[in-house]
Amino acid sequence: MADPAAQSSAQPRLQQAQSSGPTGSNSNPGAGSSDPARPGLSQQQWSSQKKAQVRSFPRAKKLEKLGVFSSCKANDACKCNGWKNPNPPTAARMELQQQAASLTETCRSCGHSLAEHVSHLENVSEEEINRLLGMVVDVENLFMSVHKEEDTDTKQVYFYLFKLLRKCILQMGKPVVEGSLGSPPFEKPNIEQGVLNFVQYKFSHLAPKERQTMYELSKMFLLCLNYWKLETPSQFRQRAQKEDAAAYKVDYTRWLCYCHVPQSNDSLPRYETCQVFGRSLLKSIFTVTRRQLLEKFRVEKDKLPPEKRTLILTHFPKFLSMLEEEIYGENSPIWEADFTMPASEGTQLGHQTVLSPVSISGSPHSKGSSASALGVTGLDVASSEPTIGEKRKLPEALTLEDAKRIRVMGDIPMELVNEVMKTITDPAAMLGPETSLLSANAARDETARLEERRGIIEFHVIGNSLSQKSNKKILMWLVGLQNVFSHQLPRMPKEYITRLVFDPKHKTLALIKDGRVIGGICFRMFPTQGFTEIVFCAVTSNEQVKGYGTHLMNHLKEYHIKHGILYFLTYADEYAIGYFKKQGFSKDIKVPKSRYLGYIKDYEGATLMECELNPRIPYTELSHIIKRQKEIIKKLIERKQNQIRKVYPGLTCFKEGVRQIPVESIPGIRETGWKPSAKEKSKELKDPDLLYNMLKNLLAQIKTHPDAWPFMEPVKKSEAPDYYEVIRFPIDLKTMTERLKNRYYVTKKLFIADLQRVITNCREYNPPDSEYCKSANTLEKFFYFKLKEAGLIDK
């Protein structure tokens, strides 16, 4: 089937001739299938051209063609069901060049004349003759489809429709699909209404421009779904339960009869998939369709117009992820028949006609109506009139005291914040270099978040089941998780890992990249106790240092917030404590011991850590939110600076050789409201000689470590010519030794910063799987262990 998804997403204007009719279902969804005799023509285009040709035949030739499908009326005893030419064409597709048969020509089968087969058509209008000829072309089309089709279920449907149209030609009737399939629409609310409700539910609070972007994405998704080729029931059975497979087969048959086949066989009444099906079909097909759709866009990204590329590759994956939550969520309001959004929740979406009962009634589509039905002929959708609503009341859960507490003394007015936000989000108002690439100060999970939006990585909560038939893909992922955990946690017995990963009481949040597992977090939920135990957490070595671990944990936090569990407990070994601290874990355990004693597994030599979740924080977007907050504060500071008239002369002490001065000695610093941090001050060692000796001893231990050899001296240009072009701030252990002798390290922070830069530079220049990076990873663990041992950093 020719799938116009890519074209329609880039330019949401649908040309009906781009979609094909029934062909072999064993082809991949979205793969084009043209008529082999006419290269470059889709099945639908070929069908349209063929109908135009036969309708231009002379009357005699038309009767001959209809006679093939007309029973003999010479007498009641004749059982001939169609006139057969006594002089059949000798080569394929020669019928157009042959002369029309005479009405006196006898049938090769029964011996009666053509006139006795078409006597019922003598007084029939030309319009009706042309309608019947259209059905003849569709019958021939379906006949070829039946022979080419390899899937049994699809072949049966094609054969049924073939017989139905043949019967209609014989009886001069109109085709009506009968039986237990029912008639459209099959479910309410339908997919179109559900998706548009989703946009209204999730994005009505956004600014008009952003809200319009989300609306465009919803139209794009609906348009793709209307022309997307569904997987066959036999393919669906391989990944689903028996009961689900039976329901899907019914929906698939309905889709073939009412949506797919009529695209190229317009004798049958045609309906849009999104207007006659609802949540049940969407649940069955969404995960597979989403993956195939994103893959298709990724492969064909160079064909997309530049103005649509960012929309499709960056925003569309996130849009689909949010929609997925509402499709499979138990209590999503978007599927309620009486779904409404109060006026106070934000401006209503424009183009309200798509939500009206008329547009979802499931009426058959006339030619060329598919584009206008979804309102995709243009993107400039007019906003509806705002409704004047009553004054909003406080939510029931929010008391008056809570409301007062929200208004912080000295808080910045929202008008000012909105004004600053416009400056930050408007590219024309922002000066300076482009920020499209990741900055040096990008958050740890920024790369992972972008990859998820683009569909490069996926997150799935999976587990083994003893009560239901095992899904082959999930079992493969569980085996992959077992391998990752075994490889990354060598001190843990493999049998023990296998037992817990495949234990039905345990679940795992799996990180999938290119169809294979590259990491995961195995956990067990204790809902009655109010906490979850994290058992294993690992990312495969060649995919580390990309922020996957942080993003993985953030997804796990959001998953638990949805399920009402707000505490994590885990036993971390000495190498994992650092990771868990970065993710918000602490050694201070607030969960009462009576709640977890006897529930979680105790590991010798490991430290119990806890993480308390805040249900108001969107963890997967937290770093992005904090970054935006910093940008706002920076802009507010700039505004404040413009109001301060007092200007101090620049500092001259650095020209005289002074390397560092206390912050409080900067002229005017205290007038801005700055105060020194007593806590930070007390942390530094006051005796410089004591600090010097401690750092000297530590540096000596690092230099004698077996994995320190690549970092002993500066990198030579002869060995790496482009090194100093890539690395802006080179550092090595020899340079650090000289700095230590010159008393450069007046604080421990300067020393630790140089040590960390040694490792960072190595990772930036060398491939992750190189010997240098492996040495850097080992050395980093060693010196952080020594720093903790010496009390220079918190344990």
From Swiss-Prot:
InterPro entries (alphabetical): Acyl_CoA_acyltransferase, Bromodomain, Bromodomain-like_sf, Bromodomain_CS, GCN5, GCN5/PCAF, GNAT_dom, PCAF_N
Domain Bromo: residue ranges: 686-790
Entry binding sites for succinyl-CoA: 537-539, 544-550, 575
UniProt keywords, alphabetically: Acyltransferase, Bromodomain, Chromosome, Cytoplasm, Cytoskeleton, Nucleus, Transcription, Transcription regulation, Transferase
Classification via PROSITE patterns: BROMODOMAIN_1, BROMODOMAIN_2, GNAT
UniProt feature, compositional bias: Polar residues: 1-18
Gene Ontology cellular-component terms listed: ATAC complex; centrosome; cytoplasm; histone acetyltransferase complex; nucleus
Amino-acid positions noted as binding acetyl-CoA in the UniProt annotation, renumbered to this chain: 537-539, 544-550, 575
Name of the featured protein: Histone acetyltransferase KAT2A
Organism phylogeny: Eukaryota, Metazoa, Chordata, Craniata, Vertebrata
